[in-house]
Design a protein with these regions (language model features):
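Conserved PLP-anchoring active-site segment centered on the Schiff-base-forming lysine
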Residues: 156-175
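Active-site phosphate-binding strand-loop segment of PLP-dependent enzymes
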Residues: 89, 189, 193-247
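N-terminal "arm"/small-domain region of PLP-dependent enzymes with the aminotransferase-like
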Residues: 44-112, 243
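PLP-dependent enzyme catalytic core of the Aspartate aminotransferase-like
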Residues: 97, 101-105, 109, 132, ...
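Active-site C-terminal subdomain of aminotransferase-like
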Residues: 241-244, 251, 256-362
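Conserved PLP-binding catalytic core of the aspartate aminotransferase-like
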Residues: 338-347, 352-387, 397, 401-402, ...
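Conserved N-terminal alpha-helix of the aminotransferase class I/II PLP-enzyme fold
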Residues: 101, 105-149
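Short hydrophobic alpha-helical segments enriched in small aliphatic residues
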Residues: 3-5, 21-22, 27-30
């Protein structure tokens, strides 16, 4: 027996009625169970139809499984000893022996986890030491730690703006910025990627609308394109129109700029960027965790009102200890920074010799443009068969008809590794005719 939910209530006896003590109650239970099964079938079909649509459009994303530590050469369940050209392991530190030693030692001194948010009982000396070290490294006044940079961006904009303010965001900003901006009550504006003329137009619109405060936010590096933001132009306009500048430097902190201080150093605008967000999950060891660094008053306000900070567990002590060690290494030696950038330049020059359409410049991210989603997956699969691990990116990660294989160079790659990767791409180019 099956009934519609709207009619089911009429069949349920009053709890005070003697019917509840009769065999009728078992009938009601059977009806309820049947109704629940029907609803479950409808729900399952609804979501399965969405999944089938994704697969039919060639947009299904597979997760390959790695069976070794993250490194330049890895094993997967599909192939052994493949060269990894799709990790954010820019400095090659994800499996660094010194960092593993520091992490192991930290367990003895600080334990495994904190089981608390920061303001209750989740702050150790190691957390404050890392915040101070990051502030010194980035030449900012103060720093606050988050479980991820996604949380850092998610908890920033609603905290520092009100409905009287305006947020002007680059159209290609990371999803975490987009989601963070959505949470804010401020009026939102979006400007064309790295387009200073359009940014100025949006600043004028915000002024005309009576915005009390204005915040410009951009990725330091647009991660799908390998393009570095025009921070000189952004800072010039921010000063002209009295706006704050926020830069997400997740794909820059630790390896972009002469000493790895990020895009502000690369663009020569250190001291002109008000707020920097970033991650420990890429160049700085590759584990997890994020941060926001900037003016002391802003950081203090985040400690008081930023919801991801107040309601998420603190960063694990071992991550703090290893990140401190990475900052120490970068402060003492630029060799890893130089190596990853040299590798990127070499890879780009060799790929251009074969006529590949490459996006971006001056960065370890070198996207190989293929435009077709299905082709990007076929090429990625064929590359793995040739011993090269890369991933095809397509909608909704990138715009439709802009599919690509995003390669990422690491300081751990050798010239021979890069030559093998270029050779495999060249063979795929001939095989698939792109």
């Amino acid at each position: 027996m099956c009934v519609h939910a709207s009619n089911f209530r009429d069949l349920v006896p009053n709890p005070k009625s003697s019917l509840c003590d009769t065999e009728n109650s078992s009938v009601i239970c059977a009806v309820a169970f049947g109704d629940r099964m029907e609803i479950d079938m409808i729900n399952r079909k609804y979501y399965q139809d969405i999944l089938d649509e994704i697969k039919g459009a060639g947009l299904w994303k597979e997760e390959r499984i790695i069976t070794t530590p993250q490194s330049a050469s890895i094993n997967t369940t599909e192939a052994d000893a493949v060269l990894n050209f799709c990790a954010n392991n820019y400095l090659g530190l994800a499996n660094n022996e010194e960092l593993k030693r520091v992490a192991a030692e930290s367990y003895e001194k600080y334990g495994y986890g904190m089981s608390s948010v920061r303001f209750i009982c989740g702050t150790q000396t190691i957390h404050k030491e890392l915040e101070a070290a990051l502030s010194k490294f980035l030449s900012t006044e103060d720093t606050i730690l988050y479980s991820s940079c996604f949380d850092a961006n998610g908890g920033l904009f609603e905290t520092i703006t009100t409905k009287e303010d305006a947020i002007i965001s680059d159209e290609l900003n990371h999803a975490s910025i987009i989601d963070g901006v959505r949470l804010a009550k401020a009026t939102k504006y979006r400007y064309k990627n790295n387009d200073m003329q359009d940014l100025e137009a949006k600043l004028k619109e915000a002024d005309a609308a009576g915005a009390k405060n204005k915040v410009i936010v951009t990725d330091g590096v647009f991660s799908m394109d390998g393009i570095i933001a025009n921070l000189v132009g952004i800072c010039d306009l921010a000063e002209k129109y009295g706006a704050l500048v926020v830069v997400d430097d997740s794909h820059a902190t630790g390896f972009v700029g002469a000493t790895g201080r990020g895009t502000a150093e690369y663009c020569g605008v250190q001291g002109r960027v008000d707020i920097i967000t970033g991650t420990f999950g890429k160049a700085l060891g590759g584990a997890s965790g994020g941060f926001t660094s900037g003016r002391r008053e802003i950081i203090d306000l985040l400690r008081q009102r930023s919801r991801p900070y107040l309601f998420s567990n603190t960063v694990a002590p071992a991550i703090c200890a290893t990140t401190l060690k990475v900052i120490e290494m970068l402060t003492a030696d630029n060799s890893l920074v130089n190596k990853v950038m040299d590798n990127a330049k070499y890879f780009r020059s060799e790929m251009e010799k074969h006529g590949f359409d490459l996006a971006g410049k001056d960065h370890a991210i070198v996207p190989v443009m293929l435009y077709d989603a299905v082709l990007s997956q076929k090429v990625a699969k064929r590359m793995l068969e040739k011993g090269i691990y890369v991933t095809g990116f397509f909608y909704p990660v990138v715009p439709k008809d802009k599919a690509r294989i995003r390669t990422q160079m690491s300081a751990a790659h050798t010239k021979a590794d890069i030559d093998k990767c270029v050779k495999a791409f060249a063979e795929c180019k001939e095989e698939f005719g792109f």
